[in-house]
């Protein structure tokens, strides 16, 4: 059994993922984040609602497999990540790109 995330809510979300697919999903009011791999959906929902002051209507999570990495003769694995696609209620939005 995996360990449960017990840290602060601010530590759940690591960073927003800005990819072509994630940028297209912004039109449907869906935001993609890299989150702590131990965080469950209720943890992610609470963190997003508290940090960004929005209403979350749904969350989809993905645990992609860890990829191997080799540097010279040393082999290892990349850090484990978890992706979360968060759907917001109508009228809510998160400003990922600050106006300059």
Curated annotation (Swiss-Prot):
Q: Which GO terms describe its biological process?
A: translation
Quaternary structure note? Part of the 50S ribosomal subunit. Contacts protein L29, and trigger factor when it is bound to the ribosome.
| PROSITE patterns according to UniProt | RIBOSOMAL_L23
Q: What does this protein do?
A: One of the early assembly proteins it binds 23S rRNA. One of the proteins that surrounds the polypeptide exit tunnel on the outside of the ribosome. Forms the main docking site for trigger factor binding to the ribosome.
Give GO cellular component annotations, separated by semicolons: ribonucleoprotein complex; ribosome
Protein name, UniProt field: Large ribosomal subunit protein uL23
The record's keywords, sorted A to Z, are:
Ribonucleoprotein, Ribosomal protein, RNA-binding, rRNA-binding
**Organism annotation:** Synechococcus sp. (strain CC9311)
An MF annotation (GO) of this entry: structural constituent of ribosome
- What family name appears in the similarity comment? Belongs to the universal ribosomal protein uL23 family.
